């Protein structure tokens, strides 16, 4: 009986301590924060304008930066990656320290003013020079043969290396899927005699390595390809501000249909509500001056950006 009474007293005492502690917390521990109305503009994390990663000065509200890498820059010698140069030019240590994130695009063909290649010389030799040298309205350069099996295999290996280096610490939040076509935009100028892009079964082999190498990054494609719908991707438009091209992009998204580069009747899939789950990105068009885009035709530019449900917009870097 004495033991039961002692146990009861202990329980009562414990209960009183809990009640007292709760009362103390309610009086002294609970804090109420009242926020005042402000006209100050705040940046949304991982949204908004993404300047180039090599910019020395960026606004305090910037949380995203854009980094594109050519294969020639990354792997000048087979199996030897120039991480030091890539990191120095794109200030990756700085952005990590400042808590910022990157949009990454890997590119194999950027038309320029001089004859050049954006794939390394060793890869040009390994693929038996399969591809097309061009000098056309876009500029000069070299378009690889993306159907070439050596090209496909080496691409997978290099993307894996990119993932090992940049895909493990959250630095890269978005992948604007490049790899194929001029500027990595998944199209080539067929009228200039350049071989058309591969069909879906081959295009998918360029896409899958990215999903595996960057499992925590969100991937965006230039068009609503059927393979993109299957894997769940966002979309990007590199002609932002150019009304005709942007309206065509909207039509691809709303209707799907034929991919004109390969004449696949169902190469594109309607993805009209993609923005509800996935990002909408891209860059401002280079065919219109920034004064026209952001001054003369500002209302038109704003309306096109709103219609695209834009998540982020990058700088035209090259």
Q: Where do the PLM segments sit?
A:
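Sec-dependent signal peptide cleavage junction
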Residues: 23-34
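Substrate-binding cleft of secreted/luminal carbohydrate-active enzymes
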Residues: 224-228, 232-318
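N-terminal Sec-pathway targeting helices
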Residues: 2-19, 26
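N-terminal substrate-binding region of glycoside hydrolase catalytic domains
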Residues: 32-146, 270, 279-317
């Amino acid at each position: 009986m004495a033991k039961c009474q002692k146990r009861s007293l202990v329980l009562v005492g414990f209960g009183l301590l809990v009640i007292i502690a709760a009362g103390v917390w309610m009086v002294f521990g609970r804090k109420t924060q009242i926020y005042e109305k402000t006209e100050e503009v705040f940046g949304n994390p991982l949204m908004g304008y993404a300047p180039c990663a090599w910019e020395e000065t960026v606004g305090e509200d910037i949380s995203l930066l854009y980094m594109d890498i050519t294969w020639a820059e990354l792997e000048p010698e087979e199996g030897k990656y120039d991480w030091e140069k890539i990191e120095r030019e794109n200030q990756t240590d700085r952005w990590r320290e400042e808590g910022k994130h990157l949009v990454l695009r890997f590119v194999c063909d950027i038309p320029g003013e001089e004859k050049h290649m954006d794939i390394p010389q060793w890869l040009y030799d390994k693929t038996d020079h399969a591809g097309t040298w061009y000098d056309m309205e876009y500029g000069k350069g070299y378009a690889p043969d993306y159907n070439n099996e050596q090209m496909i295999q080496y691409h997978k290996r290099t993307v894996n290396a990119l993932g090992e280096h940049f895909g493990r610490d959250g630095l890269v939040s978005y992948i604007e899927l490049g790899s194929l076509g001029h500027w990595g935009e998944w199209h080539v100028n067929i009228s200039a005699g350049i071989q058309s892009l591969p069909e879906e079964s081959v295009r998918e082999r360029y896409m899958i390595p990215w999903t595996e190498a960057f499992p925590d990054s969100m991937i965006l494609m230039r068009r609503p390809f059927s393979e993109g719908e299957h894997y769940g991707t966002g979309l990007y438009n590199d002609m932002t501000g150019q009304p005709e091209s942007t309206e065509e992009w909207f039509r691809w998204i709303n209707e799907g249909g034929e991919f004109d580069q390969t004449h696949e009747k169902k190469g594109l899939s309607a993805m009209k509500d993609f923005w509800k789950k996935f990002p909408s990105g891209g860059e401002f068009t280079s065919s219109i001056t920034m004064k026209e885009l952001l001054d003369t035709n500002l209302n038109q530019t704003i309306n096109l950006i709103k219609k695209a449900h834009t998540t982020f917009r990058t700088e035209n870097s090259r």
